[in-house]
A protein has these predicted regions:
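Catalytic-domain carbohydrate-binding cleft regions of carbohydrate-active enzymes
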Residues: 1-470, 478
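Conserved small/polar residues in nucleotide/adenosyl-binding loops
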Residues: 481-486
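N-terminal low-complexity segments that are often proline-rich with Ser/Thr-Pro
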Residues: 489-490
Length: 490
């Protein structure tokens, strides 16, 4: 626990204190933000390079844990010609936490399902949690006998962790070196079946709402939990990535997580977690708007490959027509996240065709726009890998000496050439935005040219997202496909 004392003890100085002895400070400076980020990447490491298919669209929901539903969603996308590359399986896909076995009764023939989806051009990403359920007796006893669990310092026994699903669990101690190969062998099982990556969830480690349980008594191989907590997720991410590469040479890893630490970009991608209005899902406008600065901050923190949960995740959808406008605007904004995943909690379906014909067509248009820009996005993905610069950039990163760009968190640069200004207000049909120096072409009509260094209001019907390209830019695009198998190696 860190204590900050800003003027409470003296007006002459501010101070803070933390347990654990002396701290090491890193002071980074430079002529601009890009130079400072270069110093940070030198300290914490280069981001992993994603496979090309990771830059497309993904579909998920909390109860997407059945073969028949997965096939139904895949067919729905291909039937309607809406591009999509990835279908996720949430935590219920596995028989027990965390044995990496397909749930009996939910999956008739998972290997055949994965082969069929691959032939349709889909990748499948599955969830994993960093725990072993006590109801999973065989694996739990194995890990317990090997000493692979975090222990309770008050008893010396395996720490009994309440978990939101699967019952009480043992927390896997990824700070112990021997755990890596053991976990890697388990996670390789669905990879051998044909899955393409992992979604590492609940890595804080999260738990149930039992406030009387004190996790600070947890003892890891490398120390007590108050010392390990912030880096626990990172130790897990490291094992998942390194074991994937060890057992699957010449394949790029796909891992997406919400819990990590400085340096996570070496192992994983990120997502922002639950972000909607849980009380009224149709009123999540402010929450959606807030995702823009959250994602921009992630990019500045050297997490260049991120996504929001498109739709907001939180809350039951009781009226799809009432949510259609918000859903459309969320997809439009999410199309310009480096990664793009539509996801909602429970069994709330969030496929585009459920929100009405107009929403389906507008969403399809937004997704097709992203796919047409894949060559452009992939180019900047490589720059993110090499230099750590985000694809989704705050305005001041490209225009550091323009004071107007310092407070423009409702728009952003997508690479250096494209300016994106998502509509984040209900019933809005216009968008107020700022154009920095230079001349800017309206990307939607390819005709209207505006001079820079001015604020202006542009039309923003529900069918489009305000988007501008700097005059003189070259924007590589590609033809769309919705049924061919994607490139596994790129």
């Amino acid at each position: 626990k860190t204590e900050f004392k800003f003027g409470t003890e003296s007006r002459d100085y501010y101070s803070f204190e933390a347990p654990g002895g002396e701290m090491i400070y890193y002071f980074m400076f430079g002529k601009d933000y890009k130079e400072i980020m270069g110093h940070y990447i030198g300290l914490t490491g280069k981001p992993i390079m994603p496979p090309k298919w990771a830059l497309g669209f993904a579909q998920c929901r909390g109860m997407l844990t059945r073969e028949d539903l997965t096939r139904e969603i895949a067919t729905g996308y291909r039937k309607r010609g809406i591009p999509c590359d990835i279908i996720y399986q949430d935590i219920g896909w596995t028989q027990n936490l965390q044995d990496f076995e397909w749930r009996k009764g939910n999956y008739k023939n998972p290997k055949q399902m994965l082969a069929d989806l691959k032939s349709q051009g889909f990748k499948v990403v599955v969830s994993q949690d960093p725990v072993i359920s006590q109801s999973n007796k065989k694996q739990w006893q194995e890990a317990d006998s090997l000493g692979y669990f975090v222990t309770d310092s008050t008893t010396g026994k395996t720490y009994d962790m309440p978990w939101p699903w699967g019952g009480n669990c043992g927390v896997v101690d990824f700070t112990k070196p021997e755990v890596a190969d053991w976990w890697g062998a388990y996670q390789q099982k669905p990879i051998n079946d044909g899955i393409s990556g992992f979604w590492t969830d609940m890595g804080e480690p999260a738990w149930s709402n039992e406030e009387d349980v004190d996790r600070l008594v947890m003892k890891h191989h490398l120390g007590m939990h108050n010392e390990i907590h912030n880096v626990y997720g990172l130790t897990w991410d490291k094992v998942v990535k390194e074991q994937f590469e060890k057992r699957n040479p010449n394949r790029r890893v796909f891992q997406m997580t919400r819990a990590a630490y400085a340096g996570l970009q070496r192992y994983t991608f990120g997502w922002t977690g639950d972000s909607g209005n849980c009380d009224d899902v149709t009123q999540g406008w402010a929450q959606m708007a807030n995702q823009i600065p959250v994602l921009l901050s992630a990019g500045l923190g050297l997490i260049p490959f991120t996504t929001t949960d498109i739709s907001g995740y939180c809350g039951d959808i009781k009226d799809y027509s009432a949510m259609a406008e918000l859903y459309t605007r969320w997809v439009q904004m999410g199309a310009f996240n480096p990664l793009s995943r539509i996801h909602h909690e429970g069994n709330n379906a969030v496929e585009p065709w459920l929100f009405g014909e107009e929403a389906e067509q507008n969403v399809k248009k937004a997704i097709e726009l992203k796919y047409s820009l894949i060559p452009y996005i992939y180019t900047y993905a490589r720059e993110a890998h090499d230099a750590g610069l985000p694809i989704m950039r705050p305005m001041f990163l490209e225009y550091p000496y323009d004071m107007e760009t310092l407070d423009t968190d409702a728009q952003f640069m997508f690479g250096k050439e494209l300016l994106i200004a998502p509509v984040v207000k209900k019933n809005a049909k216009t968008k107020n935005l700022y154009l920095p120096e230079g001349n800017w072409l309206n990307y939607n009509d390819k005709r209207t040219l505006y001079s820079g260094e001015q604020w202006l209001t542009v039309d923003a019907p529900l069918s489009c997202i305000p988007m501008f390209v700097k005059q003189g830019s070259i924007i590589p695009t590609c033809l769309l496909y919705t049924s061919d198998a994607a490139d596994d190696k790129a």
